């Protein structure tokens, strides 16, 4: 996964002004194949959903699913290191991804890091990049990354990774 996630996130963010039209492949029910691939990911897709009465697209990558908390935690940390400080260009503006790190705890069933685009402005405020580690039944930990629009101004985690 050496910088592969960073490259993918950069590609997706840079196509944000185009509504991801250059990166969406064949449509499914409510999802689209992603032309942006991650060799070790278990699934990468664009998902269409409704937000405040409008149709929006989000990008989701399931990086790993494992029964081993330590392995999931290691993958989560490696993904964070790829994204923290990542420089991207959206339209004519340059941004850096920033988020404080939180160590996933075995007793916590969900850890979420929401990256902000800096410098923040009215255009970039709603774009969120999120890294998640969550516990799923029967006994698995999943690590994934998401890019989505958010109208709310709060610190609650966004969408939970859906099953691919």
Predicted regions and their residues:
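Generic hydrophobic, helix-prone segments enriched in Leu/Val/Ile
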Residues: 1, 5-10, 71-76, 83, ...
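N-terminal leader/targeting segments
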Residues: 1-56, 163-164
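Context-gated lysine
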Residues: 2, 10, 35-37, 73-75, ...
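Hydrophobic transmembrane signal anchors and adjacent membrane-proximal interface regions, especially
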Residues: 22-25, 30-36, 44, 78-81, ...
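Aromatic-enriched hydrophobic runs in primary sequence
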Residues: 31-37, 57, 69, 75-76, ...
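Long, charged/polar, surface-exposed segments that mediate recognition or autoinhibition
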Residues: 43-107
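A charged, solvent-exposed segment within the mature domains of Sec-exported extracytoplasmic proteins
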Residues: 86-164
């Amino acid at each position: 996964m050496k910088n592969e996630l960073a490259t993918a996130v950069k590609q997706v963010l840079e196509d944000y002004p185009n509504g991801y039209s250059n990166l969406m492949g064949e449509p499914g029910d409510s999802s689209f194949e992603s032309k942006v691939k991650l060799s070790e990911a278990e699934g990468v897709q664009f998902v269409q959903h409704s937000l405040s009465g409008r149709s929006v697209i989000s990008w989701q990558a399931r990086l790993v699913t494992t029964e081993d908390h330590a392995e999931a935690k290691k993958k989560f940390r490696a993904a964070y290191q790829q994204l923290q400080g990542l420089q991207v260009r959206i339209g004519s503006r340059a941004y850096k991804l920033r988020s404080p790190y939180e160590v996933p705890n075995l007793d916590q069933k969900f850890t979420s890091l929401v990256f902000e685009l800096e410098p923040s402005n009215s255009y970039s405020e709603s774009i969120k990049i999120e890294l998640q580690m969550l516990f799923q039944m029967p006994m698995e930990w999943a690590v994934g990354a998401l890019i989505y629009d958010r109208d709310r101004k709060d610190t609650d985690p966004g969408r939970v990774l859906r099953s691919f």
